[in-house]
Design a protein with these regions (language model features):
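Serine-esterase "nucleophile elbow" of acetyl-processing enzymes
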Residues: 1-55, 61-63, 78-81, 167, ...
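Short aromatic-enriched loop/helix-cap "lid" or pocket-rim segments at secondary-structure transitions
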Residues: 16-20, 62-65, 141-145, 184-185
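Short secondary-structure transition/capping motifs
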Residues: 29, 64-68, 102
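Alpha-helical cap/lid subdomain in secreted, periplasmic
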Residues: 38, 46, 70-212
Length: 212
């Protein structure tokens, strides 16, 4: 069985911007048959296992003073241990790093992702890793800790992540080439976006011809 780790933030977890807030103090999650990870699992079949490790608010390597445990670099070693063996990995982080509180540049965010990538490379061959640059942020995200600079930085990540993928010989995919953020919050995938991202990820995974 080929085991693929999907490591990311709320767009890997499956945050639903439509139903969010319908029940006070809760986060609403798309069901498995809508999430791109769930669709990927169904498409790959019983001989594969998609290990969903998404967390709302997760960053590449920043500590969020308002939300504990969101540093992706710090969490990754334990997650890798808990999910062994891992044959392949998909990593999509960077959206939360664009928050105005961090004031990070695209290069700084990419440096954080590189540290995560190095951890993945300790257990997964580069040709079995898919690096995904996140969605472009939209103005609706201003109500959730983002600003004009955040939007600009989110649009630079595609270029810098592609350079990083080339540096380490991993596969690359830009989520922004296939989906747009919801108009409701400017940062999360819609149902249609999950389907579109799944189709792109599946194509990449199949072309990678992962061996276990």
């Amino acid at each position: 069985m080929k085991r693929t780790l999907a490591y990311g933030d709320s767009n890997t977890w499956g945050f639903d911007p439509v139903t969010w807030g319908s029940v006070p103090m809760t986060l609403e999650r798309y069901p498995e048959d809508i999430r791109w990870t769930g669709l990927l699992q169904k498409a790959l079949g019983k001989d594969a296992l998609v290990l969903e490790e998404g967390l709302c608010g997760r960053t590449t390597a920043f500590d969020d003073e308002e939300c504990d445990g969101r540093n992706g670099l710090m969490a990754l070693p334990a997650i890798l241990k808990a999910n062994q063996p891992i044959d392949a990995a998909i990593i999509m982080l960077g959206t939360n790093d664009c928050k105005s509180a961090f004031n990070a540049s695209s290069k700084e965010i990419t440096a954080g992702l590189e540290l995560c990538l190095k951890k993945l490379l300790d257990v997964v061959a580069p040709e079995n890793i898919l690096l995904i640059s996140p969605l472009y942020l939209e103005t609706a995200a201003f109500d959730f800790g983002f600003n004009d600079r955040s939007i600009a930085v989110s649009r630079e990540l595609k270029r810098d992540y592609k350079e990083l993928a080339d540096k380490y010989n991993t596969a690359f995919l830009a989520a922004s080439d296939h989906a747009k953020a919801s108009s409701l919050d400017g940062q999360h995938l819609t149902e249609e976006g999950h389907r579109a991202l799944f189709e792109a990820v599946l194509k990449s995974i199949v072309s990678m011809n992962i061996k276990n």
